[in-house]
Structure formats: structure tokens, C-alpha cells
A protein has these predicted regions:
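The conserved beta1-alpha1 loop
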Residues: 28-32
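Conserved alpha/beta-hydrolase
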Residues: 47-66
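Gly/Ala-rich beta-loop-alpha elbow adjacent to hydrolase catalytic centers
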Residues: 99-107
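Active-site nucleophile loop of the alpha/beta-hydrolase fold
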Residues: 120-126
């Protein structure tokens, strides 16, 4: 069994984890309520085995951001996701979305003008 590469970083001021070996393809993973970026590891095991990387972020009031002042409000989170996505575009020509619950909804709002290759939405709030 091989160990999946895992790198903690900050992207556009947002704590993130990048899973997998260097690739031209990536999934942006946005967790749901009470989730965190680390929960993406299970999905990353499958995606990385297929040649993808997974970039998972922490939403405000979650994970590494639990004790920070930012709030989980659409008008705050949507620009954050847009900023993360803008920094992803020069690095990965193929970007897909994996969103869970409220994270799926927030990502859909943030990226509605973008041409995502594919979106996997788990229990999206609609």
C-alpha cells in the first residue's frame, strides 16, 4: 500500500490540504456543516488513484478556522471560494468540484459563472 502525498497550505488566506501527486487535474473539495478539509481524504484516495489531485478547504467556523472571527455567511464565503478558484486556474487546466451539503450550495453560488468540467454534489442544499 502506498502513502498518498498530502500537503497543508493556505490559498487566498484559506487553510487547505492538497492531496495527491502533481497533476493537471484537480477536484476542489468543499465540505458541509460541521465538516473540515481533512474529511476529503477518503474521496482523495479514490480520485488520486485515478490521476487527480484534491484540494480541500476549510470553510469559516470549521476545522482550522473554528476559533477565527470569520463567519459562515454566503456574502463572506462566496468571494473566498472565488479567490481560491482564481488561484487554482493557472495551476490546473482541468478543475472539477466535489461539494457536500451547504458547501455544495456555496460553491455553486461562487462558481456559477465558471465552466467547471464536472461537479459532484453530495446532498446539496437547494
Amino acid at each position: 500500500m502506498t502513502t498518498m502525498k498530502k500537503q497543508e497550505l493556505t490559498l487566498a488566506g484559506v487553510p487547505a490540504i492538497l492531496y495527491g501527486e502533481r497533476s493537471r487535474k484537480v477536484y476542489l473539495y468543499v465540505h458541509g456543516k460541521n465538516g473540515c478539509k481533512e474529511e476529503a481524504e477518503r474521496f482523495a484516495n479514490t480520485a488520486c488513484a485515478a490521476g487527480w489531485q484534491v484540494l480541500a478547504i476549510d470553510l469559516p467556523e470549521h476545522g482550522a478556522r473554528k476559533d477565527r472571527p470569520e463567519q459562515l455567511l454566503p456574502w463572506a464565503v462566496v468571494p473566498e471560494i472565488q479567490a481560491v478558484y482564481a488561484r487554482m486556474q493557472p495551476v490546473w487546466p482541468h478543475i472539477r468540484l466535489y461539494g457536500v451539503s451547504i458547501g455544495a450550495w456555496l460553491a455553486m453560488q461562487a462558481l456559477r459563472a465558471e465552466k467547471l468540467e464536472k461537479a459532484l454534489l453530495v446532498s446539496p442544499v437547494v
